[in-house]
Amino acid sequence: MKVEALDKFWADKSRYDLAEKRFYEGPQKVTDRSHYSPLVSEIAKAREHIQNSLEKIDGVTLDDGLNSELAKRLAQLEGEHKELKTQVSLLNELLTATVKRLETQLKLTNGVSKEPEVEAKKPEANDDDDDVDLFGSDSEEEDGEAARIREERLAAYAAKKAKKVQIIAKSNIILDVKPWDDETDLKVMETEIRKITQDGLLWGASKFVPVAFGIQKLSISCVVEDDKVSIDWLTEEIEKLEDFVQSVDIAAFNKI
């Protein structure tokens, strides 16, 4: 540009036009820069504000309300932590006491506290004194006393056992006795049945129960001692009364 300005004559028209264009465009660019200067200022301010905000965050700059809320939360967490530690300590103590108690019970169960058996020492025989019995009379008296005590204890045990009441097993039975027909005299049949006697057999109440077509059956109860009276024997004895009895059934059987 400077070199071309010194020339008094430009032979190239295009170069002249380009120089003129550059001449006029120079002030316009300066004007555009001055026009956009407020925008550049705003951008600079925004950058400065962002930079200040970042510096505050890095320095953990918080307001008073947020600081008090955090302090309360920290105090609450510390209290809960102390309470948990106390509860854990109590649980450990309780567990230790329970384990000790169980160990003591196991020792007692396994017979740790059993009394040691004391074995009586047998007196050693002296070969030199075999022919001489210096305490013969005393040993005989002791043997007699021990035998007497043993006999007394055996007698007392036998007497105690004899006085003990023995439980006798008994059964309550209800028998249904069916006659041949309606002409059978049930009263006579009952009388014949009651004539059956045995040690341990006791006859009870009886009644006539209708069956069908005017026929009745005899329902009679009895109590028997299980060791003395057999149910099979009793039913066989009743069935022997063939003139009256057709069949015998056990209606009920209960232990007493």
UniProtKB/Swiss-Prot annotation:
Coiled coil: none
CDD domains: EF1B (cd00292)
Compositionally biased tracts (Acidic residues): 126-144
Compositionally biased intervals (Basic and acidic residues): 114-125
Taxonomic superkingdom: Eukaryota
Biological process terms in GO annotation: translational elongation
Example GO molecular function: translation elongation factor activity
Modified residues (Phosphoserine): S37, S53, S89, S137, S139
Keyword Zinc-finger: no
GO cellular component: cytosol; eukaryotic translation elongation factor 1 complex
Keywords, sorted A to Z: Elongation factor, Phosphoprotein, Protein biosynthesis
Residue ranges, annotated region (Disordered): 110-146
Similarity comment: Belongs to the EF-1-beta/EF-1-delta family.
Function field: EF-1-beta and EF-1-delta stimulate the exchange of GDP bound to EF-1-alpha to GTP.
Assembly and interaction partners: EF-1 is composed of 4 subunits: alpha, beta, delta, and gamma.
Name used for this protein in its record: Probable elongation factor 1-delta
Organism: Drosophila melanogaster (Fruit fly)
